[in-house]
């Protein structure tokens, strides 16, 4: 069952808004054979020009679904967010099922969270390095193809994971030419 944590910035979340979000985003449950118990984090922000920004993050077992949308109409933005999330689920489910068929295993679509790393470095006038954001997360075992899929779903340029084949920490990244690279760590 998907539980919702809905927060509003410069906007009071009314029952009508809450119900609309829960009804629309809650329809994603139909894509799961076993509906996971997860919290969907929804943030709705309004701006001075009356436009709204909706962000939805749903951390599942093997993938994190995330989408954001800016729109002048809050309800239209929620509809667009739902469409984006549905495309992500279908894309992920198709790849997982295709891979499972190749491995002669058939498992229902799995589900769970993984938060990507976000560490930013800023150089000030004295050339001192200041870390302005730090995150911690557990590395999930997966292969490089799953890591690339996770990176694409999150919209990031790199993704750190525990490589199932080598049992080491690896990084996949998007190259400037649009292809992907893999960095594997070795123990000395």
Swiss-Prot record:
Subcellular location: Cytoplasm
Keyword Cytoplasm: yes
Chief location of this protein within or outside the cell: cytoplasm
Alphabetical keyword list: Cytoplasm, Translation regulation
GO cellular component: cytosolic small ribosomal subunit
Gene Ontology MF annotations: ribosomal small subunit binding
Residues spanning the membrane: none
Region ranges (Disordered): 93-125
Tagged with keyword Cytoplasm: yes
GO BP, one annotated term: negative regulation of translational elongation
Quaternary data: Interacts with 100S ribosomes.
UniProt xrefs under HAMAP family: HPF (MF_00839)
Protein family according to the UniProt entry: Belongs to the HPF/YfiA ribosome-associated protein family. Long HPF subfamily.
Protein name, entry field: Ribosome hibernation promotion factor
Species: Staphylococcus carnosus (strain TM300)
């Amino acid at each position: 069952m998907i539980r919702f944590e809905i927060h509003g910035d410069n906007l009071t979340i009314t029952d009508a808004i809450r119900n609309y979000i829960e009804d629309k985003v809650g329809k994603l449950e139909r894509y799961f054979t076993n509906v996971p118990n997860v919290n969907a984090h929804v943030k709705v922000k309004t701006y001075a020009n009356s436009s709204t920004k909706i962000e939805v993050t749903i951390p599942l077992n093997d993938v994190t679904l995330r989408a954001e949308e800016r729109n002048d109409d809050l309800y239209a933005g929620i509809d667009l967010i739902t469409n984006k999330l549905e495309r992500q689920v279908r894309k992920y489910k198709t790849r997982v099922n295709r891979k499972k068929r190749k491995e002669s295993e058939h498992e229902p679509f799995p589900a769970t969270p993984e938060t990507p790393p976000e560490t930013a470095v800023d150089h000030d006038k004295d050339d001192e390095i200041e870390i302005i954001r730090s995150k911690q997360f557990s590395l999930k075992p997966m292969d490089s193809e799953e890591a690339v899929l996770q990176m694409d779903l999150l919209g990031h340029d790199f993704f750190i994971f525990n490589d199932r084949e080598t049992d080491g920490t690896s990084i996949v990244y998007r190259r400037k030419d649009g292809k992907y690279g893999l960095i594997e760590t070795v123990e000395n």
